Amino acid sequence: MLDSPYVRRVAISLQLLGLAFEHEPLSVFRTFDEFRRINPVVKAPTLVCDDGTVLMDSTLIVQYAESLARRSLLPAEPKALQHALRVTGLALAACEKSVQIYYEHTLRPEEKRHGPWLDRVTAQLLEACGALERELVEKPIDSSAGGIGLAGVTVAVTWHFIERTIPGNVPPERHPALARFSREAEALAEFAAAPHGPGTFGSD
């Protein structure tokens, strides 16, 4: 489902790489049994390759896709790659923590939530977003389709997920560069074709 930031990350990256794909909007919760028939591990995103091989994890799927496209969404120059990997790592950390907070509030009954754990995860999320804000201020990322790259996709998708699912946890006024970059990226055709939500890639 495109309500998963990891699924969106892959869908957008595949488009940027010029690779055609079919999207089956399955949920690890709402369509668990159907998902399990495709991948018994029930992990999103899952990619079924042309030969039937099943791949998991957004980073690994994008890595495989890059081999098919024979080009990378990461820069080759070591210093530029170092920066892109740092930004990508921070964005993935923020993504992981935001998903944990979202699940805690939507799946676990209130009386069973562990306050200290939620506080710790929220603190980690804020640190990651704060670091991302500083990175974008010091070294802005190109938000065009030709320049956004994997780091930019990951940042934009993560911030959009935060805004849509746990908006009260990360104040946008304290992260103006993040918010602005995400808005610019969401205006790209590749992002618009894979909107956050329960829909299908490419549907109007």
Question: What are the functions of these language-model segments?
Answer:
Residues A91-R180:
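GST-like fold's C-terminal all-alpha helical module
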Residues L47, T59, L125-E133, E190:
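Aromatic-glycine hotspot motif
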